[in-house]
Each structure stands twice: as structure tokens, then as C-alpha cells.
Amino acid sequence: MSKYSDAKELAGLTLGKKTEYANQYDASLLQPVPRSLNRDDLELGDTLPFLGHDIWTLYELSWLNSKGLPQVAVGEVYIPATSANLIESKSFKLYLNSYNQTRFASWEEVAERLTQDLSACAGEKVLVEVNPVGHYTNQPIVTMEGECIDDQDIEINSYDFDADLLAGAAGEDQVEEVLHSHLLKSNCLITNQPDWGSVEIRYQGAKIDREKLLRYLVSFREHNEFHEQCVERIFTDLMKYCQPNKLTVFARYTRRGGLDINPYRSTEQDKPAHNHRMARQ
């Protein structure tokens, strides 16, 4: 359990509570969660050690046009890691549902409304794309880059989060490589529901021991924290224990409630080259 799981900022969230589903547009449904909650726990100061975005894919986005004909789209939302707040996912889902029976004059109006409301909730300008379903016709399903570290013949008996599993993980050889794992699993901070993901780690520096890295990632299995917070924890732990010269951590989580969340944190750039979904998404 995270140190801030009982924070007063979390007490008013709709997450984990019986909820009425509105079908008329209502921006007040969005609920922010201060990023400072876990960043204080990670001892991050005002100057963040990373760039990044939280990339959301909206698979259940629908509204009515001016004549009442339903429209459907896929949305992509880029929330800067520098924003004061992350957006709580159930409130995001409820907010999107409120578009379902609301008339909008154009697709552009929908995109503008989403941008305005999500930016207000996050506390910083958010980038929004509203794309027709056909936009994705030729987009491939991808896998993560680099070498998968999952097929190791090791025994694991503990699933409690332990950052110290990375102690001594930095070797003597200097490398530049990309590793990934599909075994990332944590639990929702509020509901304890499982969150399933894959994580890609791109770095330059002392070679990281793959067994220690895999044991560390598996230790998230019973850990309660939001997606974005887990990725920032992975980033800061790798910087602390392995001290790479360059580091990028990119996780892609399976969707829930028509949304997937893909946090990206890097010393090098603020977003990935593309936002292509994986087989489990």
C-alpha cells in the first residue's frame, strides 16, 4: 500500500463508489489527482528529473451531430508530466459518457471542448486528437522494442514491492540497449483492481542485471498505485540504483472502461515517436 493511499485528496473520488451515469455533457465529472502525492513520496523536487506525457487512448468516444445522428471516434490525449494533476480514470470515463446524447455542431467543437476541459482538470494545456475509426485502418499492432527479459528460469516467492531488489544491478560494462517486459502488474490505488501492462526501458550507461530488473518489476504485482505513479517510481528507482546517463521508461497498459493509459518518462524527449497499440490493448 502506498504511503499516501489515505490522502484527503483521494477521499472524494468517484472511483470505487456506486455512480450514476450521465448522458448529457458535464465537465464537472472530471476529477484531478495531485501529482505531488506520489512525487513527495519519491522525494522529487520542483525540478523534475524527466520529461514526459501520459498518453490516453479513448476507444468509447461518441456524441450526436447537429441532426441527432450518432458519431463515433477514437481519441488520443497527451497530458504533460509537468501538469499539476493527473486525471482519475473513472471520472474520465464518466465524463466521456456524458457526451453520448449531447449534440455538437462539428468534430472540431468536440475536440475543442475536450481540450478545454481536460486542460482545466490537469492544470496545463493538453493535446487532443479526435480521429475517425478509418484513421487506424493501416496502423499496425506493435510490440515493444529491444530484448524481452521475461523468459528467465528464476524462482520468485515474494510479490511485495521492493526497490532494493535493484541494489547492485549496475554492472561494469557500459552499454546502450532497450529491454522490455510484459510482466508488469500492479493494483489500482483505490479499488485494488489489477492493472496489466508492458514496460520498455531504454538506457545508456552501466549494464543493468536482467534478473535483478525482472525481480524488481515483478515486485509491483501486489503494489497499489496509479499507472502514472508506477512508471515514475520505476524511473526514479532506476536512476537511483543504476545511474544511467540516459533513461526512458514507457509503459503501455491494457484498457479499462474504454480507456488505456500509456505513461512515458524520459531524460531525452517528452513523448514517443508514435502511439501504436499493442496486442493486449
Curated annotation (Swiss-Prot):
NADPH binds at residues 89-90, 256-257. It catalyses: 7-aminomethyl-7-carbaguanine + 2 NADP(+) = 7-cyano-7-deazaguanine + 2 NADPH + 3 H(+). It holds the Pfam family QueF. Substrate binds at residues 87-89, 227-228. The keyword Cytoplasm applies. Residues 261-281 are annotated as: Disordered. InterPro entries: GTP-CH-I_C/QueF (IPR043133), NADPH_dep_7-cyano-7-deazaG_red (IPR050084), QueF (IPR029500), QueF_N (IPR029139), QueF_type2 (IPR016428). GO terms for molecular function: preQ1 synthase activity. The keyword NADP applies. It is found in: Cytoplasm. Its EC number is 1.7.1.13. GO terms for cellular component: cytoplasm. Keywords: Cytoplasm, NADP, Oxidoreductase, Queuosine biosynthesis. GO terms for biological process: queuosine biosynthetic process; tRNA modification. Its main location: cytoplasm. Pathway: tRNA modification; tRNA-queuosine biosynthesis. The active site is at 188 (thioimide intermediate), 195 (proton donor). Homodimer. HAMAP family: QueF_type2. Belongs to the GTP cyclohydrolase I family. QueF type 2 subfamily. Catalyzes the NADPH-dependent reduction of 7-cyano-7-deazaguanine (preQ0) to 7-aminomethyl-7-deazaguanine (preQ1). This is NADPH-dependent 7-cyano-7-deazaguanine reductase. It comes from Vibrio parahaemolyticus serotype O3:K6 (strain RIMD 2210633). The gene is queF.
